[in-house]
Amino acid sequence: MKKLIQSSILLLVLSAGIHSAFAQKYFTKTGSVNFFSKTSLENIDATNKKATCVIDSKTGQIEIALLMKAFEFEKALMQEHFNENYVESDKFPKATFKGNITNITSVNFTKDGSYPVDITGKLTMHGVTKDMKTKGSIVVKSGKINATTEFQVLLADYHIEIPAVVEDKIQKSIKISATLWLEQLAQ
């Protein structure tokens, strides 16, 4: 009987540890990532509303992944050119970011508020991985998390070529912004 009680207590302690480990992670599979480039021809603007993201509130680890073909454009022809000629979505189907929120301890995930964050990591796109640093914001409201960031990407850094015909009419960098509404992972 004593061993049964000890085993039960051990099981409860282990369960509590697992529970708290899961309670540290926030997740979404409907994150919004937008890119924008102002051009003399016309603005290039697309949004992907299917980005997945996990943030570990204890360690600051963050991972984001999205399928390139999920970017939606106002014009179907732009979407076709983007996937076939620029990012070659069949060859390089996804983009990922893996990194850390370096000042995660300044974010109180149990208290409503807006917290500025510093993010470092590696962005992989078009088969190329580059180190990256950016700033962002985490807003905590009623137990939900809204993480946002905005940064510039040089197309040449990721070997994304601009055809000579339109080279002078398209910017060499694009603005990328992300809005991620995350919820605590269920236990």
Give the ranges of each region predicted by the language model.
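Bacterial Sec-dependent N-terminal signal peptides
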Residues: 1-26
